[in-house]
From Swiss-Prot:
Protein name: Thymidylate synthase
Keywords of this entry: Cytoplasm, Methyltransferase, Nucleotide biosynthesis, Transferase
Enzyme Commission number, as recorded: 2.1.1.45
Residues of the active site: 165
Record localization: Cytoplasm
Function: Catalyzes the reductive methylation of 2'-deoxyuridine-5'-monophosphate (dUMP) to 2'-deoxythymidine-5'-monophosphate (dTMP) while utilizing 5,10-methylenetetrahydrofolate (mTHF) as the methyl donor and reductant in the reaction, yielding dihydrofolate (DHF) as a by-product. This enzymatic reaction provides an intracellular de novo source of dTMP, an essential precursor for DNA biosynthesis.
Keyword Transmembrane helix attributed: no
UniProt keyword Transport, yes or no: no
GO cellular component: cytosol
Amino acid sequence: MNIEIQYLELCREILAENEQEIAEGRWTPNRTGMGTVGVFGRMLKHDFKEGFPALTTKKLFFNSVKAELLWFLAGRTDLEFLHERGCHIWDKDAARNGGKLGPIYGKQWRAWEGADGRTYDQIAWVIQQIREIAADPERPHPNSRRLVVSPWNVADLEEMALPPCHGPFQFHVKDGRLHLAVWQRSADLFLGVPFNIASYSLLLHMVAQVTGLAVGTYTHYLNDVHIYRNLLDQVRLQLTREPYPLPRLWLNPEVREIDQFTMDDIQLVDYKHHPPIRGELST
């Protein structure tokens, strides 16, 4: 099933399961001060034969998806990289933390600091393992079930402006196809999840290209799935809209290494969407 249909059904489920709580104004409290309603433990799955999962019932700002993912892959944690590419989605989190974000995703993906004092490039390592598996798929590979990248470095959590909401994630190689599963501890269903789906789907395509594999399936595990009180009307509006066919993703076929991708090497094709629905991010 198209992942957008699954996403909209999850929105409806949360509204239905929490109908009485919403009517009585009984919100689940959290660190932001903006109450939520939600559910726990859900899964979304997508096969890219149906298109690239950029939601169509509201406009996805794909430029920010690209900028943030390239920022992570560059191992950067500063705002300058994002601002140069017109992306300001991390500004509020930085403002709460004295203008700095700390050792968040990019640091952990590309320079995880171990207890032994060494740094580990998880992205380079996992791509190398995938290439080895793809080169000799009949040979048992010791790391075939260990293709995991994690941003959740317990020793660094207190220094982060925001501990990772999404990740770890795991790749899987089967029959010449590369699959990806993502685990998300905290899922802002209206603002965050559509962005996260597109970001990790893009990462899957990029890694598949540089490892010479076809793109397989995408699985997204959502734990604490919630809708903020101030975004309920936006969700209701989105649910009145009929989805369009999903767009396609174009990657520059000349790019063969993960660090070579630029903004211009990544484009959405035939992206037909409804107008944006604005909402205030709770931080």
